């Protein structure tokens, strides 16, 4: 059982009902596993993704049989720069791919041009540069920007059968089948309204299906025998006789059953029972008469041949009539007909033959061919490539290449598996092209479906949709790049002259095509996205996202309701809650918490196996297809002590349907109740009490919570907080266990011991980094020197983390009550105390950059010498013209000074005079400095300067280089010291464990032969003395010691090489885009306190805007004098139906009150107070169901217990997993322990008057988040600014410095008030009256009255549009009209 009182590095009381059998799988394993397999980083025995791509393209043959280009092997280099260096320098974190290519030059026969031998073999290594490499964070750094490749949820390759309503005929269903490959032509089979079966290739014109079969080489007679049961009719006494088969008479009999003599054995219209049929067979009935009226209009299955001449009288598929039948009776003994009346078949194939007859007849005349198979191939060629001339050989090759050529067509292993499963085939899985059998079986199954014997597929079933993760997506892109390269190589082959002996592989292969294709995917692909780094949760969920969009996926404008809807197969696989609001709803989803993706890309869900009503501990992961037919009980099913289901009848699921079943019939049970939801939804406590719409908002808004200055984990959690922190890269986890040796601001060192002896591991923490969303990222240690840590334990928190748990907000004391109308419409009233305490303060880092470029008139210069600037405006710049670190920046201040050369113009005498006085420079340069924007205020925390090779570095660059070098030197020194310490520990451990071979004296202690030296005697001995001591040990120990020395010598050499490589990168000239000579990046940290207008939310979709920040003395207060922190509107609860927030506030209040009781014990510190503390904590923890709290807490030592109790003093932490929340009786017990009234309400007093509130108020503790919709980034004003080019109206939006839209409804408001002058002003001078606004501006600047308005530009736009419709529009003014 994995349920534990521990959560991260703290204790949390867990209320789970069901014992946890397995831990939540690593949340990011899908992407890592997929990419590692692509580059074979997992060293698996199976063929890697990149190898498959190479083998699908190579070898490439010369059409003239002179050359062959083969792939030999590939190798991946190490990345040149670290992740951090790539982000700072704007580079791509990548590796180079080294491909070994072999060129074989063949000897040819001069006459036949056939290969007769090998003339020469040449091998060469070719570099494919910049293959992006996945970082440890499961992201990619592309041009300095961190990106994520989202998993694609797409249609699985294979065969799918559908039915749709006919668009032309009412109440008619059209049946279709599709064979969908991963690469190649799609094949569609479809019935039309007249029940003719057609086929389409790639949505081109349809052709009768028989054309395709003929093109595949089948004769008419073969096709008929494939699709129809053949009925043989013997002719005797001018009658047609057929074998008596009871299966032909299922249902009511259509005609009298007569024996050979004409005796009626069974009348028409009556049902032929099995008993009666058996009786007839017993009585010796073999043949029955086949009536001529049933035979008329039937079709021959084989030709009727004249016995004497051997001529064909009637060909296959001749329609029979009475005259033909009379002739047949006279001349033949028997005939074969296609039995289209048999069960499960219809006349679709016969109708297709009738349709293709005219087509082939016409082609016979135009092409001059008789062979119908060749004509069918030509017909398909003409449909696919209309207008192109064709010969029969080319047509046959074309048809073969469409479906049977591995280079052009690939079903993949998945598609083959789906085909075999659906059609009952046994084709080997390595055959990933179509076979004739595939096509025939698909057509047969479609006919069965049409005739009620097959099953329609559900395209939204997760058995028909699969996940393409990063490895597969990259392999597809790489394949596209190689296909382009393959085409270019083949073109080069054809253009080569006869002299091919001197040719090398590099002359043929152009790797740029591959690099370009891959970089296009990463920079412009729909699935490669700018990573959401607002907080650790947003990052984790972004990497777990499934998108139905992207190349080969759906288009959101055309996606219907069905594909977006929640499907029964999503249960435990795809989260039904977490999806965006808006036009992407249902198209972008998230994996459920416990879901895994198998090697074929299908999502699996975990279940426990049930045998005869007993729940076993065997856990199975099943795909949606494997789950079919299973009877599955929910996790909430009541079990007895022996894990046997208690109830005889229980509610279960089978194939998405809810039904009652006996316990003996149950085959599986859900692993846990929460497995149905995704990570973000699993973080919402009491989710089961929230409306689905609000749960959706809640899970989405948690991803928007900004990291606060001091985040705290929720008092009321769900247990998922520690799981998210465990798998997010932001936290540092110990790779190996041990004791904390040293902790400082930057590093943590862990000393441990394994089978090889002692070791020291170093972990480096990141500080004040900017994320993609401009939030701050810093890591801080949560361990201290001397602490014991286990492998995998979190030793340093990232942003939005506390004690190894996710912490995206603050616990606040809230009251549900109106407060003077300030919390109308979900507005939030906040206490000033929260702002003073920096409770919701966040730090944001902004990056500003400026480039100095090479221009035709000269080079731009970063300088402090800026024309027309006062000295006081430049005081904060250094001598290089760059802002100093630590400067407090205000809007409008210069960050980096830059001057740009003006074009050379002949100076006027005045300018010559100015130049003579003020120097040469001032005249012909212009100020192009980088200024702080209107809303930008903060402190400069870092500056990065990059200079191109060949250009002089400034003093600031040299200083930055020295600082960086000193940091590297210090790091290197620290690591060497730790390596020395590790070496000494290993040596002392070795010497203290083994006996001496001769006598030895250490200080005052003397040791005899066979003694073991005390470790304490060796601790203070230096390295050189140890060398002499080693000689007193056996040869084996001496050899081990020498090996150890050599190992550490090698490690030091590696450290030195690594350090030298870093210094080399530091000293190298920076890589900058062409034309850029210098790049300066300035980083500013801005402190954003909570303000009126900021958006806040709880975890239940209860969002609102801060409307008022009230002095804490005016806020409502409790009887003990404590003021509430936040006042929320009670009307926000009933209509939104998110009752979870009420329950959360109740449990949060319990946590706070119990915390106060623990704090009281700390304050009083009576005798044996630690014992009292332990007893109190045990009493609280005993409320949970599955934990033996007493056993756990009794094992914790006093110091650790005090640490945990201090944490609980600020609020006892609870975990209430989703669907397993705290029950009513447990709430009562907790309320009694916390001494809270049973209604959960309390008396409140008005802070302003001191009077008691009329009603008791629901006061509790709720976890509140500050979202990244900050008012500081939204407030915007404009006086004048840019105008739209066509309409001449002000543009919109803050980014463009736009105006406020005065829309149609606002115009109505002014019309209603009769404010005519204001209205005219709004629609003219303040909008698009170009002359009027210019005149108004002049009048205002001169202090004159504003003149009358003119005609708005919109009027002219309208008249021009009318003119474009060929309408003559003339404008008359009033005076002309009067005349």
Curated annotation (Swiss-Prot):
It is an enzyme of class 2 (transferase). One of its GO terms (biological process) is DNA-templated transcription. CDD domains: RNA_pol_B_RPB2. One of its GO terms (cellular component) is DNA-directed RNA polymerase complex. Gene3D superfamilies: 2.40.50.100, 2.40.50.150, 3.90.1100.10, DNA-directed RNA polymerase, beta subunit, external 1 domain, DNA-directed RNA polymerase, subunit 2, domain 6, RNA polymerase alpha subunit dimerisation domain, RNA polymerase Rpb2, domain 2. GO terms for molecular function: DNA binding; DNA-directed RNA polymerase activity; ribonucleoside binding. Pfam families: RNA_pol_Rpb2_1, RNA_pol_Rpb2_2, RNA_pol_Rpb2_3, RNA_pol_Rpb2_45, RNA_pol_Rpb2_6, RNA_pol_Rpb2_7. PROSITE patterns: RNA_POL_BETA. Its EC number is 2.7.7.6. Belongs to the RNA polymerase beta chain family. The RNAP catalytic core consists of 2 alpha, 1 beta, 1 beta' and 1 omega subunit. When a sigma factor is associated with the core the holoenzyme is formed, which can initiate transcription. This is DNA-directed RNA polymerase subunit beta.
